[in-house]
Amino acid sequence: MDKILEILKDFGIVELRPPQKKALERGLLDKNKNFLISIPTASGKTLIGEMALINHLLDGNKNPTNKKGIFIVPLKALASEKYEEFKSKYERYGLRIALSIGDYDEDEDLSKYHLIITTAEKLDSLWRHKIDWINDVSVVVVDEIHLINDETRGGTLEILLTKLKEFNVQIIGLSATIGNPDELAEWLNAELIVDDWRPVELKKGIYKNEAIEFINGEIREIKAVDNNDIYNLVVDCVKEGGCCLVFCNTKRNAVNEAKKLNLKKFLTEEEKIRLKEIAEEILSILEPPTEMCKTLAECILNGSAFHHAGLTYQHRKIVEDAFRKRLIKVICCTPTLCLNANTEILQESGFRKITELNKDEKVFALCGKEIKPVDGWKVHKTPQHEYNIVVKTVNGLEITTTPNHIFLVKENGSLKEKEAKDLKVGDYVATVDRIRVKEKDIDLSNGDLYFIGYFIGDGYTGVIEKNTLKATPDLAFNPKYPPNFDDSELHKKYFLKCRISKGVAHYIYSKKLRKIFNKLNMLTKDNKNIDAFCNLPLDKLAYLIAGLFDSDGYIYLNRKNIEFYSISEKLVEQLQFVLLRFGIHSSIRKKKTKTMVSPTNGKEYKCKDIYVLTIRDFMSIKRFYENIPLRHEEKRRKLEEIIKNKEIGQIPSEFVALRFTPIAKIWCDCGFSVDLTMFKPRTKRQRELNKKRVKLLFELLDGKKLITNYKEYYSKRKNPYFDFIVREKINGNNYYSLNEKGRVLMSLLNKHIKDKENLEEMYNFLVNLEKCPICGKPIHKEMRYSWKKECYDGDIYWDRIKEIKKIKVNDKYAYDIELPDDGSNSHYIVANGFIVHNSAGLNLPCRRAIVKDLTRFTNKGMRYIPIMEIQQCIGRAGRPGLDPYGEGIIVAKNDRDYLRAYQALTQKPEPIYSKLSNQAVLRTQLLGLIATGEIRDEYDLEWFIRNTFYAHQYGNLREVAKNINEVIRFLEENEFIIDFMPTELGKRVSELYIDPLSAKFIIDGLEEMENEEEIYYLYLISKTLEMMPNLRVYNSEELNLIDEMDSLGIKSFEIEDLEAFKTAKMLYDWINEVPEDEILKRYKIEPGILRYKVENAVWIMHALKEIAKLIGKSSDIPEKLEIRLEYGAKEDIIELLSIKYIGRVRARKLYNAGIRSIEDIINNPSKVASIIGEKIAKKILDELGVKFGQQKLSF
């Protein structure tokens, strides 16, 4: 328990939620006890699973054990999100985290990982490759375990759980509220945790007759501004500053409802301008824009939008972004779901203005609690606000943003999002403490890296003029402190001699050393850089930095700081960047230099400006001391002296000081207190002012004093002397006198201090007080600090805001950065040292969730939407830290709807049932079990089925036994198995993870094929179950389709065949580069559906290719089609498409310009660069092993 709580504290979690406490109390940490957690959304289910994982994977010392854990999620996107979240949390303890969501026909080696994040289908496919590491798994967490009820996917999850039950593993099931949790828990032999606690109050109600009737009896009248109920509900919420989600039963209804919700009259002029920009962006995604794009753009202009699977990823992302910014006020959906121009964003080469970012570099973003480089970002311009907010922190950071830009704030131990206009002085905002990069080692020793660092700082490598190297490499140093290069092979190999000139020593090196530096891409003078070393492992990078500071760095005892000087701005910026990897903070300033006159010829020489990097806060100096192995004896001595400073030694362990004046206040329980900053000011001006104040206090010992101009004692900074005086206004004059505390303090100082102007002496006297002068009790002493340990949180430092102000702006635009919505990041970027929202986040906070439809069309006609699904929809209302409450509203059109709505809001959700009797599930799963040897005869089969959830629920296996016998007969008749032994075909189909019936369709089609036509192969894959549902065929299309099919030798013309052939025609257009908009219009589909069909087609074409090899029907056409389907391109550019960084657009450009093969690219690098740009060309050539512009490093 202590280990768990200690690790949770590392994440800032100091108190568990009620369901989490209940799980621990019931024995969650018993490794042999399964659990089923059935609680509402956002109640903390995931953390319960994490506690179980921690318990298995980390020992008492927080080190990895030899066990593995699996975290199963329902969707790939969620898997990516959890992967990044868990990496950021647990890699610090040495846990290796893996994400496994790739191709099903892929045998990944996951044996070296401790925690594997995956989907049920991917784990099932891995199992079929007979993974050995499964024996090391001791805990499995299943998120959304209620999906065992899903018609198509539930059977796979049930089979997996049945297998896992036979292993010695702890199973933790995380579920939404379901109707029969006890039944599922009993099958799992699990402790059941049921709780209805929510972090934000959810008000549930029914809308009917222009009023919301809440379940708690409250009634809210809704003003009818239109005859549309949804419009009235939305307007009522929007007027109060809220946003709405409207859940519809179909994509078409979502679109139609969004079109009706015209909210223009409730939009400000600024919002209208910004929505117009967003609408234009929507229209720019596809060229030319589709009808759906145009409809969505029109809705956005009105403040509404629709959101469903038919939209492309880019469209959905833009809608989510605008809703998150509260520009779009309402989204109608199906039940799925700005910065100043001078702002500097942290990239891999350092901080750059947002308007000048390098497109080829990643930006640093928050990923969980770690700050890492993220690719796939974009910059967007938005109209500037009439005013901006300037935020300054205690630690000296400053940023200017639009009023609605979102900051991450810590309040009372919990995280909140706040817009800039809502921030206040004293708030703790997230700033960067350290950054993390993907490390890349170089074959250089620590000694060589130290040598290189020293040479970059104080070395001269000569110059190249007209391709000729002039001068020799030279390293200057103080002979009193010669550099220690004993462990440097580079020094030993290329050293020539040592000479001393005018008291300065010089090491002279061979010109060959310059060539080595050139290969490392290090330039000379003001262009020096350390590009090649920025991503070194920290233990090696430390030696390079040590060399830099031992040569051009300075340790100042009097200032108590560290500085580095260089005329190379780039070098100093890169140094600032790499220091952040150690959590070492620094600032950069430019120091102007004067013109020098030569004493020999009298000529004036303009000196280059010097860039100074300064490390001044104690934590950074301490980290520098602990991580950077300086070899310069004098510098090391000074650094040690700073660290061992007597005053620093007085700081208690629970605090870390930022400044070096340790005692800032003395106080007693009786109420006596003295702010000592009055006696130890930080500036000369403050010192003079405070002398006047203290002199006044001594004068007041004699009694009341008339002050004619008290402003000379006043400062905009703290005025601690006000604690000791009373000011009265009599007849327009200001009279001062000491209060009781003032009389005690000044009497004490008057008695013990001789020099009444010596503030230092007064300070030392008060610091050494042990007992209170009023009551005699012990004196407490408080440090002058601003950094506390609790302010450090992963890679975040919570800095306190010291100033906020509004400023008018003249800029036309503000800027946003969009980060990829792939689970790789937390949608916060590093800007001016702050961690601010990238304004394109994932969450869709809403005040009111509205369920418009209670029914939807199924294969059995119109049916009520399950209560569990409705409760999940309304559970979206009310986000912690964002809404004071949430409202889940169901619209009742009649009395029947009212009754159903009441049931949905008050009754338990429906029970979940096993879907194992589904023949499609049984075909795939039984073949998999036989192929892996888990079932070898009828007895194994019966024993396995009796352990399933199906058997637990129904007891009688007669119905499922009938289906099982039919499936076994099918597998035998089609030669997938023989006497419960898999054939080669059966094994391969199991590994390919397709339905055996789909494999039969493919085999039959290949054997009946008369002509090898591309369209025929596409027809074969379109007939598979994995491609269902196919495109709808209209009566007017049937005859033409039959004629085309007949010409290919296809003799079956059932409606399913016609639909498969129409789908094949769509895929054929795709691979022949027909414009996307034309495909969408021709086949009456949406962009998202096209993407889905293409992804599945790539998978099934791969399966067809593999099956064709086994049955002797191999051909190169399927292999080419697999690539062409992936890229949507013609055959002539396939070779080019096989190269990383080349998509169909670049491939077509290269091909049309005569670059048609890999050999052409290698032989014509300049031409390639002129066609697609030098940066991309360099990446492509590097991928092909050809260096562009530089040679490989070799000694």
UniProtKB/Swiss-Prot annotation:
Residues that, per the record, bind ATP: Q20, I39, P40, T41, A42, S43, G44, K45, T46
Residue ranges occupied by any DOD-type homing endonuclease domain in the UniProt entry: 451-584
Disulfide bond positions: none
Molecular function GO terms recorded: 3'-5' DNA helicase activity; ATP binding; ATP hydrolysis activity; DNA binding; endonuclease activity
Motif (DEAH box): 143-146
Domain Helicase ATP-binding residue range list: 26-196
PTM note: This protein undergoes a protein self splicing that involves a post-translational excision of the intervening region (intein) followed by peptide ligation.
Catalytic activity of the protein: Couples ATP hydrolysis with the unwinding of duplex DNA by translocating in the 3'-5' direction; ATP + H2O = ADP + phosphate + H(+)
Keywords recorded for this protein, A-Z: ATP-binding, Autocatalytic cleavage, DNA damage, DNA repair, DNA-binding, Endonuclease, Helicase, Hydrolase, Intron homing, Isomerase, Nuclease, Nucleotide-binding, Protein splicing
Domain of life per record: Archaea
GO BP of this protein: DNA repair; intein-mediated protein splicing; intron homing
Main function: DNA-dependent ATPase and 3'-5' DNA helicase that may be involved in repair of stalled replication forks.
Family the entry assigns: Belongs to the helicase family. Hel308 subfamily.
PANTHER family, per the entry: ATP-DEPENDENT DNA HELICASE HEL308, DNA POLYMERASE THETA, PUTATIVE (AFU_ORTHOLOGUE AFUA_1G05260)-RELATED
Protein name in UniProt: ATP-dependent DNA helicase Hel308
